[in-house]
Every structure is written in structure tokens, then in C-alpha cells.
Amino acid sequence: HPVIHRRQRQMCIRDRYITDKKFIAIGETGLDYYYENSKKNLQKESFIEHINIARKSDLPIIVHTRDADIDTINILRNESEKGKFRGLIHCFTASEELAKAALSIGLYISISGIITFKNAETLRNTVKNIPLERILVETDAPYLSPVPLRGKRNEPAFVTHTAKFLAELFNISSKELNKITTNNFFNLFTKASLEE
């Protein structure tokens, strides 16, 4: 998580886990400026280092961003100019500009239960403009339970409510959305396997 930025931890990730077949992504990393005492420079350094690790290992990066769209966009663009890397914007609630920037460098956008919230109209309008072949669905458990389970402790089984809502938003069947997002998952997380 962006608010945890320990250099020693990153070295451990790089040296110990990247070659493990069960290690399928780098992150969650990124920028989180929600808290007043956010150490922005340390977060930026850590985020860039994680992108470098992701690029070198060819593992996707899971990007967390909160109240940091401009810096996230700048880092993603600058780092993509240094070389391609794969990844997704986790629990997307950001601006249309961030969605466009992420999509322009080939990242995926992951949608959580927030999309079902009554006050998420702006988010829904942004998500409608994201190509289906770039969308994933997530829970962000134990937080952000989708309607009709809002207020309860979130769990992976609740992702079906978010997926159903998203399918309706795109005017497709839940079955079709499930097929698309499953394909997207395996296209992004190439080390993942149905066998395990």
C-alpha cells in the first residue's frame, strides 16, 4: 500500500518473490494523499521503484491512487516513456483524465462496489467510456461492499453484485461480462492459472 514505503521491503520483493510462480503481480502500490501526513516524495520514489521492478520482471503492477490523480498521471506517463509495463488501476474512483492516461499506456481499470453507490454517478459516466476489454471487477474486501450489501463487511462472493451492476451499465448480460472480465484477468495476470 502506498502509505507503507520501506526500501528494505522492496528489495525483499525483488530478490525473493518475483520468480515464485504464485507471485503474479507487483503491488498494491501508487500514491495516496488522503492523509495529512502523507510522505509524498517517499510515495513517489516507492511507486517508481515498483514500476521499475514490474517492468524488469514483466509482472503487472497494481496501482492504488487516492487524491493524487495529477501525480499518478505524470508518473505513469513518464515511466511509460522509459519502457512498457503492464498493470491496472485498482479500485478505480479517479478522474476521466486518469482513466484516459492509464488506458493510453495499456493499463486496465478495475471496478469495485463503489460503482453501485447512489452518489457514484460521475464514476459511472467515466466507466461507461472505458472499453470492456480493459475492465476488471474486484471487491477490495473487506471494504466497499456493493449495494444491496453496503455497510456489511465485504467479501469476495459479493463481486457478483458489482459485476451484475456493471453488466447492466454496459447493457450486456452478466454471462458476457463474466467472460470478458475473466479473459481480461488472464491477459493481464499471465502467470495466473485456473489449475491452481
Residues of each region from the PLM?
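Single conserved hydrophobic/aromatic residue that forms the stacking wall/gate
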Residues: 1-13
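Conserved beta-strand segments that form the floor/walls of ligand-binding pockets within enzyme
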Residues: 12, 25, 88, 108-110, ...
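Divalent metal-binding pocket/active-site signature
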Residues: 16-105, 125-126, 130, 148-157, ...
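Active-site micro-motifs of SAM-dependent methyltransferase domains
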Residues: 31, 143, 187
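Mid-to-C-terminal alpha-helical segments outside catalytic/metal-binding sites
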Residues: 53, 158-196
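Short secondary-structure capping/turn micro-motifs that flank functional sites
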Residues: 70-71, 118-119, 183
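Glycine-rich, positively charged active-site loop/lid region within alpha/beta enzyme cores that binds
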Residues: 105-172
